[in-house]
Amino acid sequence: VELISDLKEALQNRGILFTMMMFFLIQVCVMLLQPLITMYVGQLMGKVDDEAVQMAGVIFSLAGISGILAAPFWGNRGQRYGYVRTFCYITLGAGVVNLFQFFTTDVYQFAIVQFIFGLFLAGAIPNINANLAEVTDKSIRGKAFGLVTSAQMSGGFVGPLLGGALGHVLPTRLVIICAGIILIGVSAFTYFTKVKGK
């Protein structure tokens, strides 16, 4: 009941609603690859065995490793140039980099693209969180952060389900670049709507 009440309140605040949508979509993009990466790495290596499984784990972690390095940089850029503006650049860059995965021909190229993808995507969460803090009143800030966390968790389970479903009907390579297309769409939506708050 409380969740429904909170959602009704969120629908009246464009800033909270925008942030929930962005958290959801970004998490979907991150998790879309999860059910497919081992098989895809195996295809690139020409075999699906223990080595491919281990390599898939390493590659999936690369975005997180690069994120550790890049997140402070993007946070500073957001504080200096504006969180929404920086978020547009981040999602556009991540989307374009992700599209390059279509052209990878071996596992090492795929790993490099994943690492660069993480360098961009690392700045998304800090900047939309900072923007959320700016556009919400202190009285509802805790509630707002709770809602966007729920949206992020929703993306966390929708992403793998969607990736697995798409993997049944599309080549893995095309499923992967779907994330890039979504991120470019997020960037364009953010740029043209310039959502900041109420």
Residue ranges, per PLM feature:
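Intracellular juxtamembrane helix-capping segments at the cytosolic ends
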Residues: G123-T136
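Structural signature of the two symmetry-related core transmembrane helices
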Residues: R85-F100, G180
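A membrane-interface helix-boundary motif in multi-pass transporters
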Residues: A165-L183
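Juxtamembrane intracellular "pre-TM" segments in multi-pass secondary transporters
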Residues: V1-M20
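Paired small-residue
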Residues: V97, Y108-I116
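Residue-level signature of mid-helix packing/kink "hotspots" within the transmembrane helices
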Residues: G64-P72, G156-F157
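Helix-to-loop junctions at the C-terminal end of transmembrane segments
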Residues: L69-G82, G167
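Short amphipathic helix-loop junctions that connect adjacent transmembrane helices
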Residues: P35-Q54
